[in-house]
Amino acid sequence: MEILRGSPALSAFRINKLLVRCKEHLLPVSDIYAEYVHFADVSTPLNNDEQAKLTRLLKYGPSLAEHEPQGHLLLVTPRPGTISPWSSKATDIAHNCGLSKVLRLERGLAFYIHAPTLNDEQWQQLGALLHDRMMESVFSDLKQAAALFSHHQPAPFKRIEILLQGRQALEEANVRLGLALAEDEIDYLLEAFNNLGRNPTDIELYMFAQANSEHCRHKIFNADWVIDGVTQPKSLFKMIKNTFEHTPDHVLSAYKDNAAVMEGSAVGRFYTDANGQYDYHQEDAHILMKVETHNHPTAISPWPGAATGSGGEIRDEGATGRGSKPKAGLVGFSVSNLRIPGFIQPWEEEFGKPDRIVSALDIMTEGPLGGAAFNNEFGRPALTGYFRTYEERVDSHNGEELRGYHKPIMLAGGIGNIRGDHVKKGEIIVGAKLIVLGGPSMNIGLGGGAASSMASGQSDADLDFASVQRDNPEMERRCQEVIDRCWQLGEANPILFIHDVGAGGLSNAMPELVSDGGRGGRFELRDILNDEPGMSPLEVWCNESQERYVLAVAPEQLAQFDEICRRERAPYAVIGEATEELHLTMNDRHFNNQPIDLPLDVLLGKTPKMLRDVERKQVEGTPLQRDDIYLAEAVERVLHLPVVAEKTFLITIGDRSVTGMVARDQMVGPWQVPVADCAVTTASLDSYYGEAMSIGERAPVALRNFAASARLAVGEALTNIAATHIGPLTRVKLSANWMAAAGHPGEDAGLYDAVKAVGEELCPALGLTIPVGKDSMSMKTRWQEEGEDRAVTSPMSLVISAFARVEDVRNTVTPQLRTGQDNALLLIDLGAGNKALGATALAQVYRQLGRKTADVHSPEQLAGFFNAIQELVAAKALLAYHDRSDGGLIVTLAEMAFAGHCGVTVDIASQGEDTLATLFNEELGAVIQIPAARRAEVDAILALHGLADCVHYLGQAEEGTRFTINQGAEAVYQESRSTLRRWWAETSWQMQRLRDNPQCADQEHIARQDDNDPGLNVSLTFDPKEDIAAPYIAKNVRPKVAVLREQGVNSHVEMAAAFHRAGFDAIDIHMSDLLANRRNLQDFQALVACGGFSYGDVLGAGEGWAKSILFNARVRDEFAEFFLRPQTLALGVCNGCQMMSNLRELIPGADLWPRFVRNKSDRFEARFSLVEVDKSPSLFMNDMAGSRMPIAVSHGEGQVEVRDDAHLAAIEEHGLVALRYINHYGQVTENYPANPNGSSNGITAVTSTSGRATVMMPHPERVFRTVSNSWHPEEWGEDGPWMRMFRNARRQLG
């Protein structure tokens, strides 16, 4: 084993945070230093050249200090017997670099700790703080890492002796294996195996438990119900299905696949033909929708829990029909109170929690990062979401009890597109090859389906932790590329049938695949890809290793499928064949036995049906006590409540521009304020049709009125999505995610009433369909503390996600107020005169619940509201729109003022004298801003839709900072907009300070309070409407551009589209094509290296990609020859920029180029940043010098690193800087967030001395269309100014 030191692993502020954690755990640690250390398992000793190559390969990240580290060593490595995702990718890079003697690379994190007084027990405590016990181990010596490369012998399966020991043997196995089997299921299995005349194997029982868990079978939603002694006519699921029976319009697939599908638009989908050339293909892009939850894993281990939640939902989308394309995501969190240190709020009492779960603060620190990281690396923008906190002692139908989200809600959902001929799955023919596509089996995520079906605290702590999966999004990206190549073949698609691998692992996915296809299956255990040979058959078959799909492929198409997988470097294994007989057989050639030999009907047959016999329980509650509520204090408190407060800390960590098809993200207007009501994407890169999604949820209301809470969730989703141009209400489709503490007194009956209110009443009345959803029925946490039983029970929580086809994405209206003309602010109040304050944000911040809550008072008025807003949107009669929701009218107005950077003066006298109720009630409705001149027209449209009595004139938006609310002649509330904005932002700021570089967080918080900030602005030195490439395109000559990607790159399609529009033939070139000599760069006039996460940023962002070129002699020469050839152009963007900066030795005139390293914030940054084009030789930026314009930024490692000040000065003196970050005043800046990575002198793009090669961190390809800019001047046409770059390239090539 070779040992090689790596780069420093933790920044100074990360070290400080670690020291603070030590102090919190009473561990007297004075100093910590951390660096990466690499371990290489080699077949034979490396020679000097190989050693030098390996040393250079493993040199990445910040420069390593010369000194030998001092202190007590704690070495954290992956768990012996496992192979980490880092190892797989680093080893791939080594092999691609010709280091064939390297069998495997692995990486550890060496902590050198100064703590002379720690005893053995404290050292163990410290070790526990530093590692994830499910995935990592701790050693005290570097040489002990040799255990990473030890090999273990496979373990055999075990039989459960029921023939001799009977029921007792099954009961013991139930507890030992964490199967969560009910009494009647134990009886069922006992009878089934007695009839078979044999003992079950452990793998068969585990497989049954996962396939029949509440998580997978949804027993409660399919149960029979008796409430208060009365048998109910329908199950919960039948009431949901009633919405489809009532309104099947526009739904193409419901309830029978991994996601639902509704009609989309006929557009030009942009992808490659059989020769790798990109072009538009006119076809239907139908819309798929799915929303999942991943609550249990997120409570145990937030980052991987949330990451695999997003990853699983993405796989659901990709595995719909015969393969489809995930497109854009949403995410949501409900947790207990944050209790931010130094920022604990008056309503946040400490109620305790069990040790096995993490705190709400930990969840919201790590969970969103995990979800965002997966979406980022996969290449899916996350565009909307919600965040609620609730934890309180309330008076309920069970007396006083604790309600909250100790078991959190982690919501992951999204939209995608699918071809019409692939919506329905194909036929699995007998003899079809049964395939696992994706990563290897690892001993993680065992029993997730069963574990998530139990109330937290019922299962064993080790089983809880074992049930959390770990993520590898770059692997999932590779698998999706395979699926994309398959569906793009149309009728020749080799995929007959596909499912994702989720809860229960292959033990659930493979039986589901063959059963759904009307077949059985015959499998070979040892053909499953396996990174841990020591696993038992149960562990191989049932683990929930992520990023896997199961497929059926016809034997005659296997060679084609193999070719696609090899090109994309996506691992796969043929593990069996489909059989005529409905039977599962698994052979194990290592032990020459059969761990599984089971009829499918035993596994998936008619297991006992559940009966829920429950009672309704209700409590009236006490009215809100208002004596101690003062308006000024109430406003500040409500603006601090997370459900109301700014959520920038949750948003800028997620890529919101990838695909180039994002028309409306969360950030609104020139000041990029996160207040958008819905997310909108374009259906393609050549149209204005699109898709929209929004969220609605009002969970605390269920503590008083279950049905009202459900109705409000539907209503809020509608008032949110109404902001874009949809058309008829029947175009909107809903996903319903139901969370409840089943078995908790009163909750079951309340759940039934809520489902009935939505499925049988409201949705049919509105013509709405719920074709997809999910339930999580174990939302209760139990534990013991100080000798007494404790429990925190979640409110019944319905999260509604609304999805719709969009007629014209350009008509989407935002909350940004306009002040350039006479205007009017109108409140459309759907409260029908009600101003209930029960279960509002106001009640929560004063630790009350109240009595009466908001509700949907008239489905007809709600439908009229939606239709009226749609008419106004289509007529372009609205200047701004924002729904009324959490926090009430005052929050709606404040957020609109924040987005417009203006003042507001309103009069609420027309709504009665109860100021508090008027401002803080959360009845459905919206505030619209209209031109004063169109008031009569707008009033007429509202009246036509039955809303005349709902409309109140409030006042107007105006220049300045004053926020004034009058009650007739009296000003009842006055405050500056900047003060309100500061209060609203403080929760996000405090979370950023805890999680990221506090210096950056402070700079952003200060910047928000600048009343004079002019916002994003544009000053161009050219006309973006001028097509300077047109004369060259007219010659009918299209130069070829190699659109270069490596595994993990995710921005190549929009890049190809930009070059295609500029007159190039864009050709898809995978690095595997060059390494295998299938393609050669001599055939191209231009090359573009695209953005993403090549190799998951293993060995440094872009560095592994670069070294696979530099260390492969033939490919190195090919690149060198291309760069030397005159009349060629090369562009590197984001990951491609990082990669090309490491190829500078091959690029003439690039020897001064810097490296790009970790952002100063130490966080992935997704921003819409203002840049200025510098005068430079760059041929891409020709005639653009002096222009200022915003551009999409999405990266974690974009900070320019130079050797010293002289190096920086040389770059400047040679005029190689092509782009710089500037602030809104037009000044070059290093301040965050105007400069999102902290680069010196604002540098974000450099060029070679000839100008033929340019590298840049921002993404021009994602904003070449005006419509994909988060904000833009209204006069821009189809093309945004960044299109000029690509047309410049076309002009240069003549």
From Swiss-Prot:
Start and end residues of each Glutamine amidotransferase type-1 domain: 1041-1294
Biological pathway: Purine metabolism; IMP biosynthesis via de novo pathway; 5-amino-1-(5-phospho-D-ribosyl)imidazole from N(2)-formyl-N(1)-(5-phospho-D-ribosyl)glycinamide: step 1/2
Disulfide topology: none
Binding locations of ATP: 305-316, 384-386, 676, 885
Keyword Cytoplasm belongs to the record: yes
Coiled-coil annotated residue ranges, if any: none
SUPFAM superfamilies: Class I glutamine amidotransferase-like (SSF52317), FGAM synthase PurL, linker domain (SSF109736), PurM C-terminal domain-like (SSF56042), PurM N-terminal domain-like (SSF55326), PurS-like (SSF82697)
GO MF: ATP binding; metal ion binding; phosphoribosylformylglycinamidine synthase activity
Ion transport recorded as keyword: no
Enzymatic class: ligase
Subcellular localization(s) per the UniProt record: Cytoplasm
EC identifiers of the protein: 6.3.5.3
A Gene Ontology cellular-component term: cytoplasm
Catalytic activity field: N(2)-formyl-N(1)-(5-phospho-beta-D-ribosyl)glycinamide + L-glutamine + ATP + H2O = 2-formamido-N(1)-(5-O-phospho-beta-D-ribosyl)acetamidine + L-glutamate + ADP + phosphate + H(+)
Binding site for Mg(2+): D677, E716, N720, D883
Quaternary assembly: Monomer.
Its job: Phosphoribosylformylglycinamidine synthase involved in the purines biosynthetic pathway. Catalyzes the ATP-dependent conversion of formylglycinamide ribonucleotide (FGAR) and glutamine to yield formylglycinamidine ribonucleotide (FGAM) and glutamate.
Family, as annotated: In the N-terminal section; belongs to the FGAMS family.
Stated name of the protein: Phosphoribosylformylglycinamidine synthase
Native organism: Pectobacterium atrosepticum (strain SCRI 1043 / ATCC BAA-672) (Erwinia carotovora subsp. atroseptica)
